[in-house]
C-alpha cells in the first residue's frame, strides 16, 4: 500500500512552491517599503520635543505616513496628553 501511495501522491511542483515564496517576499517588501527610512527618527525627534514641555509615555505618540493617489503623502500624528491632574 505504501508503494501505491508513493506513486499516487500529488506533490506540489517546484513552480508552485517558488511562486508562493515569491508572493511572500513581495508582500514583505511592500510592508517594509511603505514606511520611509526617516520615519523612526522623525518619531523620536517629535517625542523629544514634546517631552521638553510635557512628561508623557513614549507609547502615547503614534506617527503614521499614508500614501494617497500616488503623489500625496499624509503624515498623521496622534499624541495622547496626560490629564491636568496628572501634571501636578
Swiss-Prot record:
Keywords: Cell cycle, Cell division. GO terms for biological process: cell division; regulation of division septum assembly. InterPro entries: MinE, MinE_sf. NCBIfam families: minE (TIGR01215), PRK00296.1 (NF001422). Prevents the cell division inhibition by proteins MinC and MinD at internal division sites while permitting inhibition at polar sites. This ensures cell division at the proper site by restricting the formation of a division septum at the midpoint of the long axis of the cell. Belongs to the MinE family. HAMAP family: MinE. This is Cell division topological specificity factor. The lineage of its organism: Bacteria, Pseudomonadati, Pseudomonadota, Gammaproteobacteria, Enterobacterales.
